[in-house]
């Protein structure tokens, strides 16, 4: 149906059924694909999750674009890889540029850099620059900031005694000047 409001959005729900009592952790992957108009995606996902639960399954839903702490943690780990590569190459990158949409990539890179700085005892380092593919400022920047703060809240709950970096406004560089009218629009 083209680029109308009736654009069909595919999504895939995956459930793993673990067979209790086995040493190997046998599992069976179960997939279900549905195509719905974009405005029905949220409700359809909720309905399918409810159906799986009613069948005795235990679905785990990862938000689109990896938004949330699982996605943020992935990019905390990615930043550690960047730092390891800098060490291996004997150089420091002055900037890390990336596309930012749901906020998890940028939140993870910023948190990863701050955790690395804290561990290394330094305040210098590269700038993480998110180039917005979706939201204008301040909305997009606020989404990234909330993802950073939410990630630190989660870490504090998991490890109450762990010292974590404080969020610093200047560490969040969000550029929205390249959106050209918004996501999916041609120039």
Model-found features: residue ranges?
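Gly/Ser/Thr-rich loops at beta-strand to alpha-helix junctions
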Residues: 1, 68-69, 98-107
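Catalytic phosphate/metal-binding cores of nucleic-acid and nucleotide-processing enzymes, i.e., regions
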Residues: 1, 5-6, 119
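Small/polar-residue-rich loop-to-helix segments that shape phosphate-bearing ligand pockets
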Residues: 4-89, 163, 170-185
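Short helix-loop-beta connector
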Residues: 89-95
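Active-site/ligand-binding loops adjacent to catalytic centers
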Residues: 117-187
């Amino acid at each position: 149906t083209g680029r109308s409001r009736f654009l069909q959005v595919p999504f895939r729900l995956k459930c793993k059924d673990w067979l209790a009592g086995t040493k190997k952790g046998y599992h069976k992957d179960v997939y279900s694909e549905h195509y719905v108009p974009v405005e029905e995606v949220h409700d359809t996902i909720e309905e399918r999750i409810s159906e799986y639960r009613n069948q005795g399954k235990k679905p785990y839903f990862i938000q689109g674009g990896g938004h949330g702490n699982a996605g943020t943690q992935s990019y905390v780990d990615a930043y550690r890889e960047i730092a390891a590569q800098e060490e291996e190459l004997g150089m420091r990158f002055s900037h890390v540029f990336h596309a930012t949409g749901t906020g998890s990539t940028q939140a993870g890179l910023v948190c990863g850099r701050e955790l690395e700085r804290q561990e290394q005892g330094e305040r210098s380092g590269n700038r993480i620059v998110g180039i917005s593919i979706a939201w204008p400022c301040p909305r997009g920047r606020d989404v990234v900031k909330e993802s950073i703060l939410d990630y630190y809240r989660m870490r504090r709950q998991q490890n109450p005694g762990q010292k974590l970096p404080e969020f610093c406004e200047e560490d969040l560089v969000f550029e929205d000047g390249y959106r050209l009218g918004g996501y999916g629009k041609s120039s």
